[in-house]
Amino acid sequence: GGGRASQAVFRVSRGPKSSADISGEIAFALADFVNSHTQAYADGKATAFTLASPEGGREPLMALKEWLSVGSDHDVFASGSWNIPVTYLHDWPDRYIHTTKDVAANIDPTKLKRAAFIGAAQAAILAGLTDGDGDTLVSLMGPNIVMRTGELMAQTSELGTDDRKAALRGHWSIEKRIRHSITSYVPN
């Protein structure tokens, strides 16, 4: 997903684990959707969503999904004081950031179009949720729960029993928080 000029990797970051929210699951699902369609496009396969600009690159997005990425203005709003769910779409590392070469000409129009799609689609989904969407949001969590649980098991494989149990308690607390956040968007 790195642009030719900046050689950066595109990332979809969600808020901190302390304020985990279903909006992050939606952002991750959209990243997977865009990754899949742009990979198909780059492979020369038919897709309804090429998400390519005539002036931009044709490579797949290959967006990485991650928890909170600190170091920008959104940190204040995502922190525990405000606790606002955030999705941060960004390139990192970007060799030109905060230099004299940090100019619009170094932004790949295709990557910008794809980022705009993810942001606009997430906003439209969140704004359009109805009482009947609760089960859909719960099912959206499934693949990410499996992925996160697998990552945790690998990360804690060499820990002692007590430390591993503590990590699992923290993990399931976060997953429960995400599940509970659905009621903020879909009351029933």
Q: What is each of the regions a protein language model found here?
A:
Residues 1-188:
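Secretory-pathway/membrane protein signature
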